[in-house]
């Protein structure tokens, strides 16, 4: 915090003095008057679009956020940034650009704030990469900032059955194997997404919204209400008020996003059994906040934080059920009471985590959606970092979805997702599907493999086939699936030298992933290896390849 904070630490550059007559004239044309020049200017950045249901609520929420800014004595100015729909981009060339969009969002928001000299930020997002992109921008800018999630959709209904987007991907695999009819696939397609909002389960969007709340960058309780729920409008207004109050107190994003706050976010992700993408994104956000966070910190925290949430893709419930029993604060209170959270971390309310939880008095875990710490689903957290001869720099597995922690099988190697998808009807129990050249550089963009993993599970092979990739998985992925293998294939990591018939061993309990080929043979293969030519030689993807680093460090651009 800073003594006697200036409410207009940056916007005076465009409002004060004779030299700024032209700037003031432009601002008058968008509605500002003489009475507004002394008000802090708050940028309201939104990833609203009509491309995907994930973002549809943001237009409404941005209006409410602006009302809150006005009510608190600030002046809001709204602008939009891009967003990519992972659900629509899955399984084809478009997915190369999903992770790239995270960097574009962070860069574009930073660019507008730096150019227009806004004093504070309300950041609204609904999709998997727009959430971390916004938080990365907040960390870079280090202004007073509040993040608000668009909210999730409600589960669809097919007869008496609740369905979601993962059911659609799995139905495709079942259809390819003759286990599900084309008519059943069509019925799921028409019913799984009934209203606006992000995917309903504890997939990447809901995981990152929960992480943002635990990090202290969102208002308590704001992650879980569904997108159509009008409580979100109240959270939006309160977010607008909160950012002005942060300015008054001189609290900026990096005052909130400390190492201890990131440890809180990791703890909540572990307790929820959240998406493997949280590893990638939290590492990237921490880097922008100048926080020293490493991939092995996830195991350190996961060792002591139990898995508590029985949520999809591996469990029975969705985010609206989490909301029904009290939301993310229920998990945070349980962890705080057990000494597993840092209660003294500052948040966007201007209060600490412990003070927030005392104010709202969340209920105890209900025992079904959220288990008590004394009766966890798993004794340790829902994610694990693996190392071994196949992943010297690390890999990630969602242990929350594993019925067994050990698998050894025979490699079936595919250079790219499409070849693996074509082979799904031919897979057999005991196969280890290796999909390579899908890393941050090699893909580029670390494509998510939900089309393949969903097809494998839908084909009835989810417990009998291991999938290993230097790409990523959707938050909707569950089962024997290992991602973020590093070093990636295009950098000459061991995954580049795997051949059909090699034996691969996963031991999630020991946290190892090994290629059972002797060192001399691997050395011969390495000597004969040449990386493939780049997929893109122009445009944003070509630029991204030149800048992006390893998944083990968050796939950040340097």
UniProtKB/Swiss-Prot annotation:
It holds the Pfam family ILV_EDD_C. GO terms for molecular function: 2 iron, 2 sulfur cluster binding; dihydroxy-acid dehydratase activity; magnesium ion binding. Its EC number is 4.2.1.9. It comes from the Bacteria. It catalyses: (2R)-2,3-dihydroxy-3-methylbutanoate = 3-methyl-2-oxobutanoate + H2O; (2R,3R)-2,3-dihydroxy-3-methylpentanoate = (S)-3-methyl-2-oxopentanoate + H2O. Keywords: 2Fe-2S, Amino-acid biosynthesis, Branched-chain amino acid biosynthesis, Iron, Iron-sulfur, Lyase, Magnesium, Metal-binding. The keyword Ribosomal protein does not apply. Its cofactor is [2Fe-2S] cluster; Mg(2+). Pathway: Amino-acid biosynthesis; L-isoleucine biosynthesis; L-isoleucine from 2-oxobutanoate: step 3/4; Amino-acid biosynthesis; L-valine biosynthesis; L-valine from pyruvate: step 3/4. [2Fe-2S] cluster binds at residues 54, 127, 199. It is an enzyme of class 4 (lyase). InterPro entries: DHAD_IlvD/Edd, Dihydro-acid_dehy_C, DihydroxyA_deHydtase, DiOHA_6PGluconate_deHydtase_CS, ILV_EDD_C, ILV_EDD_N, IlvD/EDD_N. Binds 1 [2Fe-2S] cluster per subunit. This cluster acts as a Lewis acid cofactor. Mg(2+) binds at residues 86, 128-129, 448. The modification N6-carboxylysine is found at residue 129. GO terms for biological process: isoleucine biosynthetic process; L-valine biosynthetic process. Homodimer. Belongs to the IlvD/Edd family. PANTHER family: DIHYDROXY-ACID DEHYDRATASE DAD, DIHYDROXY-ACID DEHYDRATASE, MITOCHONDRIAL. Functions in the biosynthesis of branched-chain amino acids. Catalyzes the dehydration of (2R,3R)-2,3-dihydroxy-3-methylpentanoate (2,3-dihydroxy-3-methylvalerate) into 2-oxo-3-methylpentanoate (2-oxo-3-methylvalerate) and of (2R)-2,3-dihydroxy-3-methylbutanoate (2,3-dihydroxyisovalerate) into 2-oxo-3-methylbutanoate (2-oxoisovalerate), the penultimate precursor to L-isoleucine and L-valine, respectively. This is Dihydroxy-acid dehydratase. The lineage of its organism: Bacteria, Bacillati, Actinomycetota, Actinomycetes, Acidothermales. The gene is ilvD.
